[in-house]
Amino acid sequence: MEEGEHPPKRPDRRSDARERALYLLYEAQAKGISATDALELQIVEPDEMTVLLVRGVDAHRARLDEAIAARATGWSLERMPVLDLNVLRLGAFELAERQDVPVAVVIDEAVELAKRFSTDNSGRFVNGVLSALTADLRPAT
């Protein structure tokens, strides 16, 4: 390694699990099946965190969608890009149910997924909606 170079960033298993969960949520919506059913159809059993995220989003989907709809000013859920909506569901689930994950990490991870897999404006959109949802789903104690 040259002087001044940094070692390559090691992959983060939690980031990978979020990405796999996004794939499964997207697949479920595209096929018109539950996310839990999409999990069951996998040939290779997903890791524990992916399962936790997918089952959590599936179990709380109505509540998550209601919260997202309330904060996504000017956007109906039906009008949102499917990937954005599923990234928002993942982020909203983590804000509401995974108190061990810092708010900044939840939002940053969701923004990165949106930037990577959706439209040019998706990162800003996801950031804005999740930032607004923080007050609803993870009030200061």
Q: Whereabouts are the PLM-identified features?
A:
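N-terminal interaction/assembly modules
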Residues: 1-123, 127-141
